[in-house]
A protein has these predicted regions:
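PLP-dependent aminotransferase class I/II
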Residues: 9, 21, 36-44, 48-54, ...
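N-terminal "arm"/small-domain region of PLP-dependent enzymes with the aminotransferase-like
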Residues: 1-31
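Active-site region of PLP-dependent enzymes
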Residues: 160-166, 173-218
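Structured loop/turn residues at beta-strand edges in well-structured enzyme cores
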Residues: 49, 74, 122, 171-172, ...
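Phosphate-binding glycine-rich loop
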Residues: 31-78, 92-96, 101-103, 168
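PLP-dependent aminotransferase-like
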Residues: 69-157, 164
Length: 218
């Protein structure tokens, strides 16, 4: 018997009428890029993550890359991350010209804080802990080490939307977080998408410019 890996048509059938109504509503506005629907969605995401800002982007990889660019991380810099994540975690680091440095994981499959100190060097600029399968990394330890070495902490929360760490929402713990809304994620859109959550006003303003070629309100 063939068992499909995933069958999104079942969910589509359940939501078809709502999706058609939404398509018509947006279609009649003539505003297919950004606009009030996206602004309302971003506000809801910020509320969910308990952050000041949520900025929608093309996908989770874009989210990571834009955060790195927003913090001017690039050529000759190093960024620490976990080796057992999807290739996008390291790929986003490479895309900005930086070098991914892998630190092994502990039994919960998340970045092992005890190994972080050995990996931090003069070129290290950030740590990207990956909250694998919705299980948050040991953020208290990671944030403490990052603060000691003046490093940015960028949460890879692609699989962890809605998760909590000691009562606090994933996405609100580090300097910024990247989320994926890919159809195979636990919370997804009809197509591919992602978003960034942050409480950093300067970063949010920079990403909003990077998000659309420097254009504002267009």
């Amino acid at each position: 018997m063939h068992v499909p890996f995933v069958n999104l048509t079942i969910q589509f059938a359940e939501l078809e009428e709502e999706l058609v109504q939404a398509f018509r509503r947006i279609g009649h506005t003539g505003q297919y890029i950004m606009g009030p629907e996206v602004e309302a969605f971003e506000a809801a995401l910020a509320n969910l993550c308990e952050t000041k800002h949520a900025i929608t982007v093309g996908n989770g990889t874009d989210a990571l890359e834009l955060i790195l660019r927003g913090y001017n991380i690039g050529k000759s810099d190093e960024v620490i991350t976990a080796p057992n994540s999807f290739i996008a975690s390291a790929g986003a680091i490479s895309a900005v010209g930086a070098t991914p440095v892998f630190v092994d994981v502990q039994d919960d499959l998340n970045l092992d804080p005890k190994l972080l100190l050995k990996a931090i060097g003069p070129k290290t600029k950030a740590i990207i802990p990956v909250h694998l399968t919705g299980n948050p990394a040991d953020m208290d330890a990671i944030l403490s080490i990052a603060k000691l070495h003046n490093l940015k902490v960028i949460e890879d929360a692609a699989q962890a939307i809605g998760a909590k760490y000691k009562g606090k929402m994933v996405g609100s713990l580090g300097h910024a977080a990247a989320f994926s809304l890919h159809p195979l994620k636990n919370f997804h859109l009809l197509g591919d998408a992602g978003f960034i959550s942050t409480n950093d006003d300067d970063l949010a303003n920079t990403i909003k410019k990077l998000q659309n070629h420097g254009l504002i309100n267009r």
